[in-house]
Amino acid sequence: VSAPYYSGDSVEIYLGDCREVLPALGRTFDAAICDPPYGSTSLAWDRWPTGWTQAVGRVTDSMWCFGSLRMFMANAAEFTQAEWRLSHDVVWEKNKGAGFHVDRIRRVHELASHWYRGAWADVCHEVPVTMDARRHRRDRFSAASDEIHGARGARNYETDEGGPRMLTSVIRAWIKHGSAIHPTQKPLAILTPLIEYAVPPGGSIIDPMAGSCSTAVAARLTGRRAVCIEADEAMCEKAARRLDQGVLPMGDVS
């Protein structure tokens, strides 16, 4: 494989088709973050790249894949043939919907499904914790002390805001279209928990269809290493400039 298009601070970008670049890397990874074309339009960039599931399966046994239910159903055979087994999925709730069909409910979500190969015990699956748990305690009324007047004892009410809880399967992450460099760019707020689930601290991630390389930005934020592959040289250049700007705080969710 040729030298990386970009390399710096635990991140590499390779220019090319992932089906050709992946076998040439000669490396394995803790997990993959994949955002393939959904095939929902007739646009050239939205065509499903046949064979990518097998190519990814040769370098990792754990994968998060974004998509729509229609996409997963239409290409189910490719996942099966590559010996990927479905673990579970999460729903990414978006602030802006897609689709303009007047006879269908406006879709404001996408799916991210987790797939694995081999033994479940051999892949990382550490459920992230969020600090937004809420505990409410309300003491019951005491027994009526005066049936005529209906007098009751005092009550107390307490609530604790914040605290740890396991991440739930619906994740809200807003898109900032004004700052995005790619039309299907994923927010860091959806990528970060997926990475924390499937990749141990200091571990490695492969993104075979990287686009804006948001996976690489999220990897830096969480202390992981990332290799990104992108077929569009113009997008590689934009992503490289973005990575050269350094890690932005999580408030920048795009």
Please describe what each predicted stretch is.
Residues 39:
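Active-site beta-alpha loop architecture of Rossmann-like, nucleotide-cofactor-dependent enzymes
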Residues 21, 67, 71-75, 218, ...:
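Phosphate- and divalent-cation-binding pockets in alpha/beta enzyme and binding domains
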Residues 4-13:
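Beta-strand-turn-beta hairpins that frame and shape the catalytic cleft
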